[in-house]
Amino acid sequence: MTNEDKMILDEYVDYCNRNNINIKSIGMAQLMIESSHATSELYTKHHNPFGIKYTENADYKATYKTTEFCDGKEIECNADFAGYYDLNGCFDDYKRITHADTIHDFATYLDYLNEIGYATNPAYIRLILDVINDYNLTEYDGVTINNDSLFDELDEIIEKLARKVINGDFGNGDDRKRALGGYYTIIQDRVNELLK
């Protein structure tokens, strides 16, 4: 963990403690991923270590070239990201988007990130779990968690969503792709396995 990581993570943990956010490790992992270990220009210039896209809740708009995933393929495009005058503005927006202050277990938190399409990378949840595991971030949550169980929870989320696809909850074709966003490929692969 870099000194830059440590500084921003300490600020986030303090924010969590003041704002009833019990599961800190998931947000901490996202901070590390989205800010490229606290080095991205989006973080250093615009106080947006979470990579939050622009909405009316941001203080201003910052446009950057980024990599998105569409139908499992990487594409480069310009995207409008949120800019904030300070980190608290970003932390407040993240809490609003993710409901981090009302979700109190890992599976629900990860499932919700997937549900809202927080990222288009189909491996995003796995990346979060890898960072949590690599840096033992669950120690900040104040609960003991078997890190292997984190991957089991990811598999449970994929399984749950795949069964919803089979039940027709996400429609077909383009409707399904839109509904599942960047997670379409990994979930559709599981659907195909279940239907064999």
PLM-predicted stretches and their roles:
Residues 1-156:
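Catalytic cores of secreted/periplasmic lytic hydrolases that degrade extracellular macromolecules
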Residues 87-90, 176, 187:
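Amphipathic alpha-helical interface surfaces
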Residues 151-153, 179-182:
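Tandem-repeat/low-complexity and Cys-motif detector
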Residues 165-166, 191:
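Hydrophobic aliphatic residue packing
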